[in-house]
Amino acid sequence: MAHAPARCPSARGSGDGEMGKPRNVALITGITGQDGSYLAEFLLEKGYEVHGIVRRSSSFNTGRIEHLYKNPQAHIEGNMKLHYGDLTDSTCLVKIINEVKPTEIYNLGAQSHVKISFDLAEYTADVDGVGTLRLLDAVKTCGLINSVKFYQASTSELYGKVQEIPQKETTPFYPRSPYGAAKLYAYWIVVNFREAYNLFAVNGILFNHESPRRGANFVTRKISRSVAKIYLGQLECFSLGNLDAKRDWGHAKDYVEAMWLMLQNDEPEDFVIATGEVHSVREFVEKSFLHIGKTIVWEGKNENEVGRCKETGKVHVTVDLKYYRPTEVDFLQGDCTKAKQKLNWKPRVAFDELVREMVHADVELMRTNPNA
């Protein structure tokens, strides 16, 4: 029986730099996204050299990381360096990994919108599923199996039609979308590389995490933006889908710390990262409006339900069936006991504080740039 090669005691310590300092070089896919930008900030503060893979687009898509350039006006790089690449192109991944020789890889790049994955099912599978395999294979091709640690952004959408409440690392998966199914393949191929090649590879099963940097087509950010516009008189009403969907919402800033902690653990293990608290979309709406001094009262049922302002009588929220998913995920609640015990991690930002931060940030943004 063939034996797996021995794993380095610390992949981070490989290739010591000057004066015997450990070489801390991170490669982040999805660096321009919400999580990627917070993770880049976090790692730069820890003294890492950070490399990010960005897709080429006709307009700059680096808004969330502009401030991390040495000279943001001239896009002059300091300890953060960007490389054009794509998870659908294995050649470029091999080239970048061979050039950078990272000690830690964080695979955050994905088509991450669940509803859109029903329209872009094949693309989602290619990027989120096979893209993860391409990245892992690139590590193997470059001979870095024993000197790199690999973090895979897994998701609570793996649980989908939940088999137990709350969901933990041992809960059976039942994805309910092309996104969830693609991420399920990614989850298992990471486990396979860990077991077959002794790669230090982990899955972070992250429950919903939000921030002012959340993409505008995600429900929480759609709510905070719309509420800000209503407060500023730029909008009167907006539409949502399933108001009673319940989620475990945390702050992205807390969750990127958990990603890093997983790679500092002695052994590669998968972890659920969550708050353990559940709130509905309806509740997110109500709390958002309270932050601009409005009380929402609900009238009607199902697609005819509306949210009316108690103070003015104006309808600010309606329901539109087009925002429902073909197969809904009604309830997600994570149990992060393992992360608390083994990583000493816990969420810091409470739900109320998260909602307040998002609404206030969007009020400032919409005040200066209504079309942002």
From Swiss-Prot:
<keyword id="KW-0007">Acetylation</keyword>
<feature type="binding site">
    <location>
        <begin position="55"/>
        <end position="58"/>
    </location>
    <ligand>
        <name>NADP(+)</name>
    </ligand>
</feature>
<feature type="binding site">
    <location>
        <begin position="108"/>
        <end position="112"/>
    </location>
    <ligand>
        <name>NADP(+)</name>
    </ligand>
</feature>
<feature type="binding site">
    <location>
        <position position="209"/>
    </location>
    <ligand>
        <name>NADP(+)</name>
    </ligand>
</feature>
<dbReference type="GO" id="GO:0008446">
    <property type="term" value="F:GDP-mannose 4,6-dehydratase activity"/>
</dbReference>
<feature type="binding site">
    <location>
        <begin position="86"/>
        <end position="87"/>
    </location>
    <ligand>
        <name>NADP(+)</name>
    </ligand>
</feature>
<keyword id="KW-0521">NADP</keyword>
<dbReference type="GO" id="GO:0019673">
    <property type="term" value="P:GDP-mannose metabolic process"/>
</dbReference>
<keyword id="KW-0456">Lyase</keyword>
<feature type="binding site">
    <location>
        <begin position="30"/>
        <end position="35"/>
    </location>
    <ligand>
        <name>NADP(+)</name>
    </ligand>
</feature>
<dbReference type="GO" id="GO:0042350">
    <property type="term" value="P:GDP-L-fucose biosynthetic process"/>
</dbReference>
<feature type="binding site">
    <location>
        <position position="123"/>
    </location>
    <ligand>
        <name>NADP(+)</name>
    </ligand>
</feature>
<feature type="active site" description="Nucleophile">
    <location>
        <position position="179"/>
    </location>
</feature>
<feature type="modified residue" description="N-acetylalanine">
    <location>
        <position position="2"/>
    </location>
</feature>
<protein>
    <recommendedName>
        <fullName>GDP-mannose 4,6 dehydratase</fullName>
        <ecNumber>4.2.1.47</ecNumber>
    </recommendedName>
</protein>
<dbReference type="InterPro" id="IPR036291">
    <property type="entry name" value="NAD(P)-bd_dom_sf"/>
</dbReference>
<comment type="function">
    <text>Catalyzes the conversion of GDP-D-mannose to GDP-4-dehydro-6-deoxy-D-mannose.</text>
</comment>
<dbReference type="InterPro" id="IPR006368">
    <property type="entry name" value="GDP_Man_deHydtase"/>
</dbReference>
<comment type="similarity">
    <text>Belongs to the NAD(P)-dependent epimerase/dehydratase family. GDP-mannose 4,6-dehydratase subfamily.</text>
</comment>
<feature type="region of interest" description="Disordered">
    <location>
        <begin position="1"/>
        <end position="20"/>
    </location>
</feature>
<dbReference type="GO" id="GO:0007219">
    <property type="term" value="P:Notch signaling pathway"/>
</dbReference>
<feature type="active site">
    <location>
        <position position="155"/>
    </location>
</feature>
<keyword id="KW-0597">Phosphoprotein</keyword>
<feature type="modified residue" description="Phosphotyrosine">
    <location>
        <position position="323"/>
    </location>
</feature>
<dbReference type="Pfam" id="PF16363">
    <property type="entry name" value="GDP_Man_Dehyd"/>
</dbReference>
<feature type="active site" description="Nucleophile">
    <location>
        <position position="157"/>
    </location>
</feature>
<feature type="binding site">
    <location>
        <position position="214"/>
    </location>
    <ligand>
        <name>NADP(+)</name>
    </ligand>
</feature>
<dbReference type="GO" id="GO:0005829">
    <property type="term" value="C:cytosol"/>
</dbReference>
<dbReference type="GO" id="GO:0070401">
    <property type="term" value="F:NADP+ binding"/>
</dbReference>
<feature type="binding site">
    <location>
        <position position="183"/>
    </location>
    <ligand>
        <name>NADP(+)</name>
    </ligand>
</feature>
<dbReference type="GO" id="GO:0005737">
    <property type="term" value="C:cytoplasm"/>
</dbReference>
<dbReference type="GO" id="GO:0042351">
    <property type="term" value="P:'de novo' GDP-L-fucose biosynthetic process"/>
</dbReference>
<dbReference type="InterPro" id="IPR016040">
    <property type="entry name" value="NAD(P)-bd_dom"/>
</dbReference>
<comment type="pathway">
    <text>Nucleotide-sugar biosynthesis; GDP-L-fucose biosynthesis via de novo pathway; GDP-L-fucose from GDP-alpha-D-mannose: step 1/2.</text>
</comment>
<dbReference type="GO" id="GO:0070062">
    <property type="term" value="C:extracellular exosome"/>
</dbReference>
<dbReference type="GO" id="GO:0042802">
    <property type="term" value="F:identical protein binding"/>
</dbReference>
